[in-house]
């Protein structure tokens, strides 16, 4: 059923380096492929290259720094690949001429929201500018808006699909909102050199299993959130802004938390300019 595993997420190191190693060992034992994490920074950034209708497609994944930010891959230590523009550009430049398509799958965004931040939009469009052919985001537990930029698809977050070993308690039923129970799959196809995606929408049923539904049956108003994204970013000069996410650390009384300082697209732009000259 699953041939390739994306390991780049903010929980892959919850059981430490041994947990990551065991995960990789089990994937390899099943003769499957993985990407997005590894025993070093270089290994975590290696793509999986798949063949689709005779076209070579490179899959890269990177994870935004979050509450467990010390667990990310470093030069010689294991973890998921960190979501850093300079790393992604280096990787795209290395593989651009040897594959037909490059897809980046970032694990990012503010949880339980239907819009990305301005920083995410800037980073996504900068990645398309340097040769990425599609972006498919995860992490927020919700469906977020999506767009086509320069004819390339950008899905900021596709929501939840399966929650392994989910304990369906009364509190779970209460706290897991209707928006968290909606998701979508992307069916990818390549014909005549064109990379296309077909959205398949799903909802979790009472047993927390996904069922295919029509877009009109979703509580998430896809048309509205996509229209808001287009309207709010219509005049965004993304090339004038810093491409990396604006993050900071904050102690919440128990632990250090990573805060995304950029505003959601549904609010006003507060992205960081590259320089005064660029801003002008």
Set out the residue ranges of the language-model regions.
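Conserved beta-sheet core of the metallophosphoesterase superfamily
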Residues: 2-4, 118-184
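Structural recognition of the beta-strand scaffold that forms the well-ordered cores
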Residues: 3-8, 33-36, 57-61, 101-105, ...
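Metal-dependent catalytic neighborhoods of phosphoester/phosphodiester hydrolases
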Residues: 8-30, 113-120, 146-150
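Short acidic, glycine-rich surface-loop motifs adjacent to enzyme active sites
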Residues: 8-10, 92-115
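Catalytic metal-binding/acid-base residues of hydrolase active sites
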Residues: 10-12, 39-40, 63-65, 107-111, ...
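Acidic/histidine-rich helix-loop elements
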Residues: 14, 64-86, 110-113, 162-178
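Binuclear metal-dependent hydrolase catalytic cores centered on His/Asp/Glu-rich metal-binding motifs
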Residues: 51-102, 122
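A short C-terminal boundary segment appended to hydrolase-like catalytic domains
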Residues: 172-280
């Amino acid at each position: 059923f699953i041939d390739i595993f994306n390991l780049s997420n903010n929980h892959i190191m919850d059981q430490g380096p041994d947990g990551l190693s065991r995960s990789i060992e089990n994937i390899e034992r099943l003769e499957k492929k993985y990407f997005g994490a590894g025993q070093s920074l270089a290994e975590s950034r290696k793509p999986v290259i798949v063949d689709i209708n005779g076209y070579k497609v490179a899959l890269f994944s990177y994870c935004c720094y979050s509450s467990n930010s010390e667990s990310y891959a470093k030069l010689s230590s294991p973890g998921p690949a960190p979501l850093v523009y300079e790393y992604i550009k280096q990787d795209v430049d290395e593989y651009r001429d040897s594959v037909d398509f490059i897809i980046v799958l970032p694990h990012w965004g503010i949880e339980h929201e239907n819009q990305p931040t301005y920083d995410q939009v800037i980073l996504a469009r900068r990645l398309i500018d340097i040769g990425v052919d599609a972006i498919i985001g995860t992490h927020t537990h919700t469906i977020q808006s999506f767009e086509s930029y320069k004819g390339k698809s950008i899905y900021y977050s596709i929501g939840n699909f399966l929650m392994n070993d989910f304990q369906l308690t009364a509190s779970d039923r209460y706290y897991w909102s209707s928006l968290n129970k909606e998701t979508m799959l992307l069916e990818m196809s390549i014909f005549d050199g064109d990379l296309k995606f077909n959205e398949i929408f799903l909802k979790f049923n009472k047993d927390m299993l996904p069922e295919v539904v029509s877009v009109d049956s979703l509580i998430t108003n896809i048309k509205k959130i996509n229209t808001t994204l287009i309207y709010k970013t219509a005049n965004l000069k993304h090339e004038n802004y810093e491409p990396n996410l604006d993050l900071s650390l904050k102690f919440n009384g128990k632990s250090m938390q990573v805060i995304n300082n950029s505003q959601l697209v549904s609010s006003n732009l507060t992205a960081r300019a590259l320089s005064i000259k660029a801003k002008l």
